[in-house]
Amino acid sequence: MLSAPSSSTTPASPPTSPPNTTSSDDFAVLKEPKVEAILNSELGLAILNDRIKDYLLTCKELAGFFKKRSILEEESGKNLQKLAKSYLETFQSKHHSPQSFSASVITSMEIHEQLANHSLTLQKTLSAFSDQVIEFHKNAERKRKSIKEYAKKQENAYLEAVMQMDKSKSRFKGAETEYNRALDNKNTGDSQKKVGFFKPKSNAQLTKLEDEARLKAENAESDMHSKIENAQNVQKQLLCIHRPNYIKQFFSLQREIESSLIANYLRYTKLCESNTLLNGLTIRPQKPTPTNCGLQHALDNINANTDFVQYVLHASIKHEDNKNPTDASKTKIIQPPSSYGTGSSAGKTNPPVNPTIKVTAAIPSPLQNTNPAPSTFPNPSVASPAFPNSSTSNPSTAPASASPLASTLKPSTANDTNGSSSSSSSNPRTSSPLASNAENKPPVAQQSPPVLLPTLPPIQTTTIQTSREVAPPPSSINSNRAASPFRPTSVSPQPSSPTKSLLFGARLDAIILREHSNIPNIVMQCTSQVENFGLNLQGIYRVPSSSARVNMLRSQFENNPLLQLHTPEDYENDVHAVADLLKIFFRELREPLIPDNHQRDFIDAGNVEDESRRRDAVHRAINDLPDANYSTIRHLTIHLAKIKENSDVNKMSTNNLAIIWGPTIIKQATIPEISSFSRTIEILIDYCFTIFDYD
């Protein structure tokens, strides 16, 4: 006789975490008439078990949320920490001068490091939350199985008692029938006649048969009464003890899971609030301190005027050794009196000329003019080589670095100004280094006879100016360029690299992240069009389309990855083009739909001989895929299963689909590996709704 299991001996009540705090008032909901009638029926066990499974699924999803949130916080914290540390080192190494702006930026980078540390702390706490919820889920799952096993044991005991009762009733009815037949034979024994070779039974034989039938019927009746009594007792215990017991255990487990979920989510909300508050106080504390001043207070300490003064003083000290020996602010330039002879220009005063030292290094040549030009250096201590006319070189092409000769020259003093001015005024070509060739020509009457000289290579000229020069006008630049024997080399523009597609050849997870969906839009559009207009199309995915239509449809998706296909007119009524585009998309993924590090699992699963074991191996390999790949291959497999259901019309069996899609989903595989993977595709299609849940 079965009895109700006690809480100390039955495995149906394992230790709970958190402890069960279900009070008697909580069980009042079980006393409602409709609820009590349903739970005490045969449906009660299945309903309560499904309820607990739903809660456990929610618990598992919550643990997954905590885990993924911790991963995001870890990535965010590490990236922010790396970024802040990098720029903190940059500002500390490059900005040596004590400036308030640099100090404020450094303080802000330190604050960002604190924010990164907060994110890492939050990540550790969330990871601990996830581990705790997963551990609780495992314990609750064990308790659910234990309660279910106990409940099924009691239900099966009752069903077994009822079945034994029915069998005993059948045996009693059979024995009763035999007894009645034996009694009838005894009563009609005197009138029996010989039939064939068999003699009629005697009265003694008929009496013996009657006694045996009566004894058998009495035993069957006794067994039937005992089985009926046993079934009644088992039913009474089930309805009064066992069934209410496991209903309460299921209900208590449900309350326990509810309490755990609410408590953990409440801890999560408090953690988010505290982390947000901590970040806010770090960014803007209520009472700024030297160690925690906040971003706003750090920016308030910026003083642009003080920074400018400190920078100028610091720069003056830094450039003390590299200052110009001729300071325009400390040099007094006197305009000497000059006489330009008779003519209309007599009595006029030339504008002041910026003191300029020109050093022209001539290239020795036997054809060079032996008559030296008047030296522009009045100082006799400096040897004046034969310099050609300075107008033959363009000052704009002077190199940036001076020649060694220029470093030994000194600018003209006030005593030498007359000589240099008169020499420069007597030669109009040296009066201004910025004048153009056309403006420097003297009047026709004053020009000397032309002297034919051979063409010399360009002469390098080094010019040291003691004051700021004004850029030459565009006309002068153009004229000098025209006179120059050199021409700029025309450089053909480099062809621009083709624009990288954001869809074809990209990573699957990047596409899904960019589109904010679980499945790429192009996959959704292509599969929906094939299911709506191509299920009955013979040779779908096997018969190719024209490349022009496929390329046109491809360009449309490249220009707009979120393109929507509504009617067959959007792709010229060619469903084969849509099917080809879908295969091209999966074939050109940067990483195949089955990643390289998972391909071996699928290939090994296809090599398993037993079909049920091969299905289990494929199921395990599918569950190990990343989320993006799992959702996409799930959608594709359900789509191919729909294609296979119409194989009588479209002639695309499971084997045909596997042969076509095997090389498309994986890459860099040998022929035997592709053959094994094709068997894996067949398992996916045939057992689609066993491996995947159909939503």
UniProtKB/Swiss-Prot annotation:
The record marks R542 as: Arginine finger. One of its GO terms (molecular function) is GTPase activator activity. Residues 1-26, 320-499 are annotated as: Disordered. Residues 506-692 form the Rho-GAP domain. One of its GO terms (cellular component) is cytoplasmic side of plasma membrane. SMART domains: FCH (SM00055), RhoGAP (SM00324). Keywords: Coiled coil, GTPase activation, Phosphoprotein. Residues 336-348, 366-382 have a biased composition (Polar residues). Residues 1-11, 383-432, 458-467, 488-499 have a biased composition (Low complexity). The modification Phosphoserine is found at S496, S497. One of its GO terms (biological process) is actin cytoskeleton organization. Residues 33-307 form the F-BAR domain. This is Probable Rho-GTPase-activating protein 7. It comes from Schizosaccharomyces pombe (strain 972 / ATCC 24843) (Fission yeast). The gene is rga7.
